[in-house]
Amino acid sequence: MMMLNLKKLSRVKIPLLILAFGFLSLTACQSDFTKLVKAEAATGEKYTDLIFNIKMGQTQKDFYTQCWELNKKGLISQGPGNQSVLYVIDSTSTFFPSDNKIDMLFYGVFDDKKNIVGMKMKFSYAAWAPWNEDLQSDDLMNQLSSDLLAPYPGNNFIDFDTKDEAHPAKVKIDGDRQIHMFILDSRYVELRIENTLLKYNL
């Protein structure tokens, strides 16, 4: 079993394409979305669970310790270039089951104090190929829109207009939690979980 190189992992982050699309910095023309964010925050609902008992507010050391324990159990492995953690979602997955195997890469987002303030994820079908029309990223995002409601219950995902037809996006707001995902290319869907109180200074 390949063991995680946590020392090296601590120096790298998942490459995340930061698109020039609106929901990373809301503008006045998106007032409906802004109202939604504020209304959900006003409910007082708090969501700290991220994945595998990793939670908002934990330290970077906590993150590495939990990943190490999961790796020893054979539940996760080292991602490409040791820049992330790899978890394979299949029909027996406790995260959510999928008949088509899905590779999920994830890595914590940390603030200046090295506390967890979010999570980055990247999904792709394990059997993806350019000619496999049923395993493209648009199919995957549609599947994730429903399957992710199991580990992250609450409101449904809604379409978010990025003004970029090549990178359609969806977003889900529950209390102080925002989950947004977008199509990176024909293979990958990227996702980020964040705290709206921190993100938008609410």
PLM features per residue range, with description:
Residues 4-16:
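Bacterial N-terminal signal peptides that target proteins for export
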Residues 15-23:
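Sec-dependent N-terminal signal peptides
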Residues 25-28:
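C-terminal motif of bacterial Sec signal peptides marking the signal peptidase cleavage site
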Residues 30-33:
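Bacterial signal peptide processing site
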Residues 49-85:
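Post-signal-peptide N-terminal segment of Sec-exported extracytoplasmic proteins
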Residues 96-164:
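Long, charged/polar, surface-exposed segments that mediate recognition or autoinhibition
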Residues 102, 121-124, 171-202:
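An acidic-aromatic pocket/loop used at catalytic or ligand-binding sites
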